[in-house]
Curated annotation (Swiss-Prot):
This is tRNA(Met) cytidine acetyltransferase TmcA. ATP binds at Q176, G198, R199, G200, K201, S202, T203, L204, A205, G206, M207, R320. Belongs to the RNA cytidine acetyltransferase family. TmcA subfamily. It is an enzyme of class 2 (transferase). The gene is tmcA. Keywords: Acyltransferase, ATP-binding, Cytoplasm, Nucleotide-binding, RNA-binding, Transferase, tRNA processing, tRNA-binding.
Amino acid sequence: MLPELSAIQAEMQQQGLRRLLVLSGDHNWCHQQAHELQQEFMGDWLWISYRKEKAVLPEKAAGLLGQEYLHGVFDATEGLNAEALAILAGTLKAGSWLVMMVPSWHQWNDQPDRDSIRWNEQSGAIPTPNFIQHIQRQIANDRQVLLWRQNDPFYIPELPQYREWQLPDGQPTAHQHTILARLLRANQGVWVIIAPRGRGKSTLAGMLIQQWQGHCWLTAPAKATTEVVRCYSSEKGQFWAVDNLLKYCRQNSVSDIDWLLIDEAAAIPTPQLFELISYFPRILLTTTVQGYEGTGRGFLHKFCAEIPGCHILNLTEPMRWAESDPLENWLEEALLFDDAVPANHSAKAIGYHVYQQQQWIQQPELLKQFYGILTSAHYKTSPLDLRRLLDAKGMQFVAALGNNTLIGALWMVEEGGLSAELAHEIWAGRRRPRGNLVAQSLAAHSGLPQAAVLKSQRISRVAVQVNRRRQGIAQGMIAFQRERAEEQGMDFISVSFGYTAELWALWQKCGFQLVRIGTHLEASSGCYTAMAIFPLSQQGIALCVQAQQQLARDAYWLESQIGFSLPVDDQADQRLNQNDWQELAGFAFAHRPLSASLPALQRLLLNCGLPLTALRNHLQREMSIEQCVTELRLNGHKALTLLWRQETAQALVSLDEKLAMYWQEWTTVFSEANRLHHPICH
């Protein structure tokens, strides 16, 4: 076995190729074969594994971006983290083996996958038969993948020959030289270099900094990923963390800076990108729009398309390995990185179809189209979404088809149906089980525990082919699914999104009602989280009415935090009502967070004459947490929160001792005694 692999290894070095070798069997056997390969072939042999000592854990693999290694081992015997697999492949140099250890071939389907704990809505690891069948098919169908199964003869197929490959000498390629010349002549504008991994976009950015006769700054989601840029720039350009750069630009002139280079731009929230490009005369953004950071072609359609005169440049020729690299080709097929969707210009009637997860495996072309549309529309789509799509529990899928071609995709997630006892604990801040994003959030943050008991479906993703947008297709899919959800006995359907006036107008057009706005910016979108629902049952309508009334009542205090007006009618009445007492009791006697209780606490301060120094310092005098801790000589944030809760309890007792005692008991546990006034029961 080893002499044959040695001959293949020598050819890989000469031809600039990387290959996948799959070891399938029990863990000890796989580990032994991988160890023998490591002894035979000199190299870095980076391991990603849950089990091997000193290996990189799959969830820590992102820290490897921007680095290079010779040979790697990916241990998938306990679970297959698809992003980590792609990241490891992206770090491997020409001539590398990627050795993937997997369970016994015929038992792999039935084995619980540890990675499913990350993305399945339910607790505990589950088998993932659909994804495993998909991966097994890709391994078996690719004649350039070597598969060695325990207790079976190791058959090495005849491999095609490639011409000899020359390692880049550090000078720009002809294509890089052409782009670099254009950039060096630029007077102003936004330039975007788009390329898959290994094409030299970071190298090109570094060359621009090195050759530019002026000042260049560099930013990226993480400094570690800019190692190549800084290497080729001779460390000339100053690096800034995104948040620090924005803070500096808001307070200082940057007119003497000629270029801002933004590496891995698609991983930065678009509002931050739009603000950054407003400060500098020349901007260069480099990014990949296919791959493991969850950066799809939505970056082109949603960001680049909104910039007048944006110059989009592409690098296609690989620099770190040869053209038609077997490992890259296999990975693109296995993780569906090629998101090209067949164009459909037909104006014929559109039909809506429901699909089950098993059909993705039975019709792989359908899977490719459905996932491709999601990737083209959402530039945060990643291999984790592919795993959810294939095997996560409680998923429903609708597709819009025109002329037998898929032109729209809708992905729903089942939520709610929790017990009254668990919903009460979620409301009280004592429990936060996995899943149920909107249903739990309405209970935990909006004070609506009944939302977690009612049955609902959440829109996880909705996407339409680029050339068929603004034709009512998304609206049609949602209306189709809304009817299905009503037939299935759902109480409401929901959606969570980063709030912008434009996005809210879209959901409002689909009939949704705004029920919640968060007060912390989302890392992914740079916007505040908004939640909206479309009620389907009488209980759903009652929930919607109560949620809207509460949002309108809290709007004044929420708007002061988020800095813009909400599309609701503010209520001027600041007297305490029953909902306020319930909320304040949850803060004083349970574990509801300050952010959820803040509007009720502000009303409490207006209606109570007690000093309540800790609360007033933070909420009325707007002292920071650090200032409050120092002023009151407390031992940190936890001590301050405890004091806030004690002051709230003191205020409630001072207003009505009997009522305060009732609500204290009410918060303790859901029981027959508190059913009368419990929103879960109404």
